[in-house]
Regions:
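Conserved aromatic beta-strand anchor motif in extracellular beta-sandwich/beta-rich domains
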Residues: 89-91
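Extracellular attachment/recognition segments
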Residues: 2-83, 93
């Protein structure tokens, strides 16, 4: 049976910028698990241009000796205002 865990973080991308955001699961990551992050803009009541995912990079880190994936998303905000967003992290392991 698969185990699914979800975490949500809140971030903001400034107006008219391209910025890298780095995500990882943390200490309870298990080898051979599936890790991903989805982005959900939270610009309530604003007519907005969608955020663009310019690049997606995946690497492995071991900050305390335990291997875990690290996802680097490059996002572009073409709006003339800052856009807050949720980063929904998912980890699936068996």
């Amino acid at each position: 049976m698969a185990h699914v865990k979800v975490k949500t973080g809140e971030y903001t991308i400034p107006a008219l910028t391209t910025q890298d955001f780095t995500f990882w699961w943390g200490d309870d990551y298990l080898p051979a698990a599936y890790f991903n992050v989805s982005i959900e803009p939270n610009a309530e009541g604003l007519g907005m241009i969608p955020l663009r995912e310019e690049r997606r990079q995946l690497t492995t880190i071991a900050p305390n000796g335990h291997r875990q994936p690290q996802l680097i998303l490059t996002l572009r905000n073409n709006n003339h205002f800052d856009v807050p967003f949720f980063a929904n992290h998912i980890l699936v392991s068996v």
